[in-house]
Amino acid sequence: MEFARRARRLYPDREAVVDGDLRFTYAEFLERCDRWSSALQDLGVGQGDRVAYIAPNTHSHLEAYYAVPQIGAVLVPVNYRLLPDDFEYIINHCGAKVVCAHPDYIEAIDGIRGKLEGVEHFVALEGSGDDWIDYEAALATHSPDYKEIEIAETDLLTINYTS
């Protein structure tokens, strides 16, 4: 994570992320990551907890690659091309506490929601739905001051499933 902090310090106004019409500088992008870390901690996510993501390559998905591990949680990117039964298996097998989904996959997750044993929170990465946390609203209402924790180089960072 130090390389990201260094980039923010040295190049805060340099463009870092382009997602369609959205553009973020290093400072903007990493502040969003920090806000998401803070929001996750407020949801009770801590060291070793799994956060599953079902999304194509978007800025919010990229933010997860910084926000989740910097609080010691484990990122579980799920191949969005899979079927709902596969989503169910992966989410349950990894023990996800939070599921974050792009709007294209919310209906699929809602269809298996009752079978997702340990999931405590569902986050809509764009917009919101019934019983879904609005990602952008969570960023807007949280400080970038997350609680920093000690992370060892042997700590689990991500769980990747192959198809």
What residues fall within each predicted segment?
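Conserved AMP-binding/adenylate-forming core of the ANL superfamily
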Residues: 13-58, 62-66, 83-88, 134-140
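ANL superfamily adenylate-forming
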Residues: 106-154
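Conserved ATP-dependent adenylate/AMP-binding module captured primarily in the ANL superfamily
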Residues: 82-111, 141
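Short hydrophobic alpha-helices that are characteristic scaffold elements of the AMP-binding
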Residues: 66-71, 93
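A short N-terminal helical cap/helix-turn-helix that marks the beginning
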Residues: 1-16
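Short beta->alpha connector loops at strand-helix junctions that form conserved
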Residues: 78-79, 102-103, 126
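Conserved adenylation A10 loop of the ANL superfamily
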Residues: 12, 159-163
